[in-house]
Amino acid sequence: MGTEANSDVYSTAINGINEIGYPDKEKEEDLGLEVQKKKEKKQKKKKGKNVDDLKQELDLEDHKLSIEELEAKYETSLQGLTSARAAEILARDGPNTLTPPKGTPEIIKFLKQMIGGFSLLLWAGAILCWIAYGILYAQDHNTSRDNLYLGIVLAVVVILTGCFAYFQEAKSTNIMASFNQMIPQQAVVTRNGQKLEIPAKDLVVGDLVDVKGGDRIPADLRIIFAQGCKVDNSSLTGESEAQPRSSEFTHENPLETKNIAFYSTTCLEGTARGFVINTGDQTIIGRIASLASGVGNEKTPIAVEIEHFVHIVAGVAVSVGVLFFIIAICMGYSALNSIIFLIGIIVANVPEGLLATVTVTLSLTAKRMAKKNCLVKNLEAVETLGSTSIICSDKTGTLTQNRMTVAHLWFDDHIHIADTSEDQSHHSFEQTPETWNALCKIVSLCNRAEFKAGQDDVPIMKKVAVGDASETALLKFSEVITGNVMNIRSQNRKVCEIPFNSTNKFQLSIHETDDPQDQRLLLVMKGAPERILEKCSTIMIGGKELPLDESMKDSFQTAYMELGGLGERVLGFCHLYLPEEEYPSSYAFDIESMNFPTSNLCFVGLLSMIDPPRSTVPDAVTKCRSAGIKVIMVTGDHPITAKAIARSVGIISAGSETVDDIAKRLNIPVEQVNKREAKAAVVNGGELKDMSSEELDDILTNHAEIVFARTSPQQKLIIVEGCQRQNYVVAVTGDGVNDSPALKKADIGIAMGIAGSDAAKNAADMILLDDNFASIVTGVEEGRLIFDNIKKSIGYTLTKNVAELCPFLIYIIADIPLPIGTITILFIDLGTDIIPSVSFAYEKAERDIMNRKPRRKNVDRLVNQQLALYAYLQIGIIQSVGAFLNYFTVMAEQGFLPHTLVGIRIDWEKINNQDLEDSYGQEWTFSQRQFLEWTGYTAFFVSIVVEQLADLIIRKTRRNSVFQQGLFRNKFLLMGLASQVIIAAFLSYCPEMPYALKFTPLRAQYWFVAAPYALLIFVYDEIRKLFIRRYPGSWWDKNMYY
C-alpha cells in the first residue's frame, strides 16, 4: 500500500478538520487494524479457531499501561524474567511461532486432480468399457478388444491431464510458509539480569527484548525505551512512511500509538527496548495468518461450470442409455446384450478429448497473459477474472504510481500545477520569479534525503534515494528543476540542523550562501503549514517581503484548504537571512538552546504532494464500467486522499456526489440528506466497524461508486464477503500481509508483483508483474475470451457426439451392421478433434466482448440449454444424416441396399456364416463382411471429419458472421482444419490399418458424399447469426444464441 502512510509532519488541523495526517482521535481511535486483546478468561477455547472470531476487532490495553503496571501484569521486571519462569510460560503458551495450517498431503492433492470434474466422467467411461469387455470376454474368448483398449486410453488421458494440472498447481506455495519467512530467527533478551541471544521461537510473554536498526521485531512489544527508533510497518499496515517509536502513549488506537512495535515488522534505525506482550498466533500477524488460512478455497466459477456440464453430459448419457436398454429388452435382446448396449451408449456420450482441451486451453491463455504482465498461479483463475463483476482495488501502487510526487505549489499568491507524470519533465509554471528561486532553494537545502551513489546514468525519477517518501519526492522535484541538488548543497554548506520531530513539527537548517557578495547565513525551515505560518511575520510576494497581514493569511488559508481538500499532503516553507553582525560565520549555534531566531521569519510558499494516479488507470476504469464491472477502492488511507484519487481515476465520476457533497451543495446537515440520492459513497473504517451486514449490503446495492477508506484487514475481508452475498464475482487486489485474508477469500485474488509481500503473492491466484491496474482489465478481457472460447470448443465437441451415438441406436433398433466402431470414435475424439478444439484458445474476441455485462453466476452457464439443443438437435442431426448417407452409399455400392441391411445383424455377425447373400445374390464370407463393415466405419468416420470442418469454422463466432471475424485470421484454426484431413487420410490409406485399427482405404468419391451437408451446416449457421444480429431481443435471439 506504499505511500498511504501518515507522518506527523502533515498531522495538522484545518479549521478543525484533520488534514492528511493522523485522523482525529475521537473519529479514528478504533480504525486501522485493531489488535486482538489477549483473552485471559479461564474458559478453554477449542484449538480450531473460528474464522468469525478472528474477524472481530478487539482492543489492546497494554499501550495505556505504565511500566509498573506492565511489570505487575506480566510478572516481570527491568531485570527480565528468570529462566525458570520463562520455561513455565513457554510450556504454557507454546513457542513463538505461527501454527501451520493442517496441510493436505501431496497424494491427496494428486488424487483430487485425478477424480475431479471431467476426470470422474472419463473414469466412469473407462470402468464401463472394462466391464463391457469383461462380459463379452466371459461369453467368447475371441471377442473384440475394442472396449479394453478404449478403457485404457481413457485412463491414460485422465492420468496425463491430471499430472499436468497437479504440477501446474504445485507451483503455488503455502501461505503460512511465506509468513514464516518474515519471522526473525534470533532475539536479544534480558533474563536473570543478563542479556542473551536466543532463538526468537523461545521468546515468551513478559520477556524484555532489545532491538536495533536492521532487526526484525521478534514479537509484539510494548516499548519502554527508545532512541531514534523508526520501524517499517508496510508489510502489516501498508504504510510506507517510517513510523517513529518511543515509550509514549500517543493514541488510543494500538496501531497509531508509538509505544507498540509489531511482530515481523522491521526496525529501520535507532534502538528500542520493550516487554513482549504477545507471541506466535496471538500477535497481529498471527491473527492475520489464521484469518488467511481459515478462509477461501471456494470453487472457481469455471470449476462450477465444468461440474454443471459433467452433470448434463452424465444425465443425457445415462437417460439415453437407460431408455435404449429398455427398448433393447422390449425388442427381445438378452439382458446381457442390453447391458452392453447401455454401456456403449453411455461411453459414446463421454467427450473424451474435452478434459485435455480445457486444460491445454487454460494453460495457453495463462502463458499469453504472462506476456501481458499477468502471472496466473491457478489455471482456473484465468476464466474467473473474466467473470468478475466487482473489483475491490487497493489504492497505492495499483491505481497510483506508488511514489510521492509534488503536485501543486502556492507562491506569489497563486496555485501552480506541477507535472505528476512518470518523468516530471514538463512543469508548466513560471520558474523565473525571485519568489520561486527562494522557494526552490529552501526545498533543496531543507532536506535530508540523498541519492545513492553510482546512479549517474539512471533517470532522475527512477533513482533510488535514502530518505522517507516525502523527502524523496522533494529531492527528485528539486533535481528535475535545478539540475543538481548536491551541487547547490555543496555551495551552501550546512552549518547546523534541527531534524523534524513530532513536538516541533518542523525541520530547520542554517547554511552559508553561495553569494560571495553576501556573507549572511541563511536559515531555512519547512513543516506543518500553520506551524510555519505562526513563525512568520512577513511573506514574499514578487520577490519582495511584505507584511503578513490578515488578507494574506486568508489567502494562505484558502490555498491550504484547497490543496488539503484535494487529498494532498501540504508543507509550508520559510526562510530568514541572519544579520551578519549578530551571527558571523564563526558563531557557535546550539540546537538544544536554539540560540538563533525561530520567529519573525519570511513565509515563502506551500508545496503539496500526492501519490499520483497511473496514467493508464482512468481509461482502464472506463473500460471496466462499459464492461459492467463495478470498481471499488478499498484503502487504508485517509478518506480525503482516497476520495481525491477516486475522482481523478474515474472510480467516482465527474457528476457523482456523495452524501457530504449533497449536504454542502444544499447547505443542510448531512443527517438530512437521503443517502440513496447519492450515487457515490465514501465509507470510513470507523463507520464500517459499527455497520450491520444489512447496512453494508444496502451500501453495496444502492451506490454505484464506492470508496472504503481507513479499512483494516478484517474489514477488507468483510467487504469481500458483503459483495459475495450479493452474488457478485469478486476480484481483490493487494500487496501487504494485511491483504492476504481478503485475497484468499475473493473469487480471484490479485497480488502486486513488485510491491507485493510473499504472503500476498501466495494467497493470490494471479500476480500483476507491473503492479498496474490496467493489466487487470487486460486480464478481464482474456478471461471473458477464454469463457467464450471454451464454450465454442464444447459446442464443437458436443456436435459430433450425436453422430457418434446414433449408429449405436440404429444398430439396436434396426438390427443393422454397426456403422462405426468404438476405436474409430476414439480417433475422432482424441485424434482429429484435439488440435481443432485447442485452436479455439487462439481465437480473437468478438467485437462486443468488453461491452457485455459480466455473466451471472448460475444463470449464464458454460453449457446452457440453447447450446445443448443447437449442438445435439440441430447441427448434430445434420451431421448424423450426412454420415449415414455415406455409410449406406458404401454398403449399397457393394451390394447391400438399405432395406436389406435392416434385421441382418445377427446373420452378419455369425463367424461360421460364410455365404451371406447381398441384394444381388452375391455371397459374402465372414472375413469379407468384416472388411466391408470396416469400410463402413471409415466412410462414417470421414463424413464426420468433413462435417466437422464446417462445424469448426462456424464455431469461430457466436453472434458475428465468420466473414466479419475474418475467416483465416486464426492460423491455429487453419492448422486444425489441415490436421483433421491429414489424420483422416493417414488412418484411411496407411498400410496395415485395416487389421490394426479397422480403417480401410476409401475411394475418393466417398470423401465428398457428406460435403453438401457440411455446406448446409455453414449456411444454416450464418442465417442463424444474421437473424440474431438483425432481431436482438427477439424469440430467435433468446433461443438461438448460445
UniProtKB/Swiss-Prot annotation:
Stretches that traverse the bilayer: 106-126, 150-170, 307-326, 339-356, 791-810, 821-841, 862-884, 937-956, 971-989, 1005-1025
Biased composition (Basic residues): 38-48
Lumenal side: 127-149, 327-338, 811-820, 885-936, 990-1004
PROSITE patterns according to UniProt: ATPASE_E1_E2
Taxonomy, superkingdom: Eukaryota
GO molecular function: ATP binding; ATP hydrolysis activity; metal ion binding; P-type potassium:proton transporter activity; P-type sodium:potassium-exchanging transporter activity
Residue numbers binding Mg(2+): D735, D739
PANTHER family: POTASSIUM-TRANSPORTING ATPASE ALPHA CHAIN 2, SODIUM/POTASSIUM-TRANSPORTING ATPASE SUBUNIT ALPHA
Protein known as: Potassium-transporting ATPase alpha chain 2
Species this chain originates from: Rhinella marina
Source taxonomy: Eukaryota, Metazoa, Chordata, Craniata, Vertebrata
